[in-house]
UniProtKB/Swiss-Prot annotation:
Intervals of motif Q motif: 14-42
Helicase C-terminal domain segment(s): 283-437
Protein name stated in the entry: ATP-dependent rRNA helicase spb4
GO cellular component assignments: 90S preribosome; cytosol; nucleolus; nucleoplasm; preribosome, large subunit precursor
Keyword vocabulary terms for this entry: ATP-binding, Coiled coil, Helicase, Hydrolase, Nucleotide-binding, Nucleus, Ribosome biogenesis, RNA-binding, rRNA processing
Pfam families referenced in this protein's UniProt entry, alphabetically: CTE_SPB4, CTT_SPB4, DEAD, Helicase_C
Subcellular location per the Swiss-Prot or TrEMBL entry: Nucleus, Nucleolus
Naturally occurring in which organism (per UniProt): Aspergillus oryzae (strain ATCC 42149 / RIB 40) (Yellow koji mold)
Principal EC category: hydrolase
PANTHER family: ATP-DEPENDENT RNA HELICASE DBPA (PTHR47959:SF1), ATP-DEPENDENT RNA HELICASE RHLE-RELATED (PTHR47959)
Keyword Nucleotide-binding on entry: yes
């Protein structure tokens, strides 16, 4: 029986869908606690069930998954006869293993209410319990999950041949491998529906060729659905996927002014915190303790995998024991990713997931209270997806992005232009020099205890800088504006790494640390043994002779010649960089070039606007610039 909707919501009642839903589907959504459809479900489900191609753009956490799962299972269960053995009726493609797995488990929850399908998916293992048997002519949905890293292609094919699934949920690469087998069939007589979840990400450069190869193997006469939180940014590529006169569904959220221009849930409050460089990490502790009630599930976003590895070791020293810190990134083995993801989801104590953008899209992590972006993403469109991990399904959530003082504060205006407004963090936070010193001291103590942690820190810092230098809003995030010494101390480094970006740095590269590097040891005995061997080799004859030769070469080279050589090398580097940029530009489509031009124009206009505002403030003429703006205070989590 369908759940009874609240008064005044009959247009979103589950039993009011046309074509009507099966009774078992109504029972399933009722048991899941969905009293009525979300706006995206109310719009997309009837269209997709009515044999329309759909392009669905909706805010994150709006119920997109059921918007395509329900039409697919309804379609497969309303066929005139069962799909032939080893024939596929529908495919759902996801960009990540985690999202594909999540979709698959939601599908299993749905099919548990359809006895014929449930009997195939979860056969009883207890011989004393009589199994309900259904004739072979009974229509069933038999799904298979295809994930790279957890099984081999041969194992996937073996399972396909044994179970003959008619619905595949997969990542692009593993799906293409299966479809390449002559034993897997997707003819027009059998294949019904294709869904691309997180479509804009699937259409990124990394997936284009694979996706095109998949689509070539599918019949043109099919129903296709593209679902994403930002499908508008990939509209120019949708035609290539082969939609036939698609219906576009766009669901937006009203902002406080009443205008439908926000691209995030109304229950999500997005904020920023300007943080002095030296306080980059101890600010995280302030944020966690300033929010009331204490967030039970928090996500910290870092920019790189190396950064996650290093921060997972040092942040507990700063945050204390109040929170369980769990790391997750794309370079973890598949079993580690799954284990850590489940640890976070199932944690009953306050937990923090420290992750990269692998967790920014699609994953429906329940009950996330707080999202903190330690580093703003290099791709601005990822910002909204990171924030959207909180405030899902109407639950109150809070997101914070950390910005350095100065030019980075222009990012606030940049986001506003992109219809993603952020407000100042609602709780006042004060920083003290002694606190920063204590944090640096605690981290350095751990780093000094094991040279391996120093190596991880150096690698993490370099990878962070490379990510920072590739930010699309490059006039806001400028490497030249970074405070190197404060950053190094905040990261707990013992010295700044050797990098081209530090070529003209004249400050203290040792960061005030006096250390005998020859005596600096690894905790791991094998690594320490190898280090000592290399150290001894460098001190023996070959190393001495080589050093002597280098000294002689240096002594016989005129200073003017060395300067000239450096200038030539710098010139060659600049020429090489220009060639690379030219080649990259030539390989871009006109649409991609136009996007870059628009971003550059947007950033420049924001820079000019902010410069003018700063000039007016200095002149004392902008007292009322922000008058009349309502500030919404965060009232706690649900």
């Amino acid at each position: 029986m369908a759940p009874k909707p609240p008064a005044g919501t009959s247009s979103r009642a589950w039993d009011g869908v046309s074509p009507s839903l099966s009774e078992w589907v109504l029972e399933a959504v009722s048991s899941m606690g969905f009293t009525r459809m979300t706006p995206v479900q109310a719009s997309a489900i009837p269209l997709f069930m009515a044999h329309k191609d759909v392009v669905v753009e909706a805010v994150t956490g709006s119920g997109k998954t059921l918007s395509f799962l329900i039409p697919i299972v309804e379609k497969l269960l309303r066929l005139e006869e069962p799909i032939k053995k080893h024939h596929v009726g529908a495919i759902i493609i996801s960009p990540t293993r985690e999202l594909a797995s999540q979709i698959y488990h939601v599908l299993l929850s749905l099919l548990a209410f359809h006895p014929p399908s449930a009997s195939v998916i979860n056969p009883s293992e207890d011989d004393d319990v009589p199994r309900q048997k259904f004739p072979s002519s009974t229509l069933k949905v038999v799904p298979q999950l295809l994930l790279g890293g957890s099984t081999t292609p041969a194992e996937d094919l073996s399972k396909f041949l044994k179970q003959s699934p008619n619905l595949l949920v997969s990542t692009p690469g593993r799906l293409l491998e299966l479809l390449s087998s002559p034993h897997v069939h997707c003819p027009q007589s059998s294949f019904e529906m294709l869904v691309l979840d997180e479509a804009d990400r699937l259409l990124d450069l990394g997936f284009k060729e694979t996706l095109q190869n998949i689509i070539r193997r599918l019949p043109k006469q099919r129903r296709t659905g593209l679902f994403s939180a930002s499908i508008s940014e990939a509209v120019d590529q949708i035609v290539r996927v082969g939609l036939r006169n698609p219906v576009k569904v766009m669901v937006k959220v009203k902002g406080t002014s009443g205008a439908q221009d926000k691209r995030t849930p109304a229950s999500l409050q997005m904020t920023y915190l300007t943080t002095p460089t030296i306080h980059k990490f101890d600010a995280l502790k302030h944020i966690l303790h300033s929010v009331d009630p204490t967030p039970q599930k928090t996500i910290f976003f870092a920019s790189t995998c190396s950064g996650v590895d290093y921060l997972s070791a040092i942040l507990p020293l700063i945050l204390g024991d109040d929170f369980q810190l769990i790391s997750l990134h794309g370079k973890h083995p598949a079993n580690v990713r799954e284990k850590n993801f489940n640890r976070f989801v199932n944690s009953y104590s306050p937990a923090i997931l420290l992750t990269t953008d692998v967790a920014s899209r699609g994953l429906d992590i329940p009950s996330v209270d707080l999202v903190v972006q330690i580093d703003p993403p290099s791709d601005p469109k990822t910002f909204i997806h990171r924030c959207g991990r909180a405030g899902r399904a109407g639950r109150r959530g809070l997101s914070v992005v950390l910005l350095h003082p100065g030019r980075e504060e222009d990012y606030v205006s940049f986001l506003e232009v992109r219809k993603t407004p952020v407000a100042p963090f609602p709780h006042p936070i004060s920083f003290s020099e002694s606190e920063a010193t204590a944090a640096t001291k605690a981290v350095r103590k751990a780093v000094l205890a094991d040279r391996a942690l120093h190596d991880r820190g150096q690698k993490a810092f370099v990878s962070w800088l490379r990510s920072y230098s590739k930010h699309q809003a490059s006039s806001i995030f400028r490497v030249a504006d970074l405070d190197w010494e404060s950053l190094g101390k905040a990261w707990g480094l013992l010295k700044l790494p050797k990098m081209p970006e530090l070529r003209n740095f004249t400050g203290d590269r040792t960061l005030g640390v006096n250390l005998d590097w020859d005596d600096y040891k690894y905790k791991d005995k094998q690594r320490e043994k190898r280090r000592i061997e290399l150290l001894q080799e460098s001190k023996e004859g070959d190393g001495t002779q080589e050093s002597s030769n280098k000294r002689k070469a240096t002594e016989t080279t005129a200073w003017s010649n060395k300067l000239d050589d450096r200038n030539k090398k710098q010139k060659r580097r600049e020429q090489k960089q220009r060639r690379q940029e030219k080649n990259k530009w030539e390989k871009m489509t006109e649409e991609e070039r136009q996007k870059i031009r628009e971003t550059e124009q947007m950033v420049e206009s924001i820079r000019v606007k902010n410069e003018e505002e700063r000039r007016l403030r200095r002149a004392g003429k902008a007292e009322a610039a922000n008058a009349g703006k309502d500030e919404e205070e965060f009232e706690g989590f649900d």
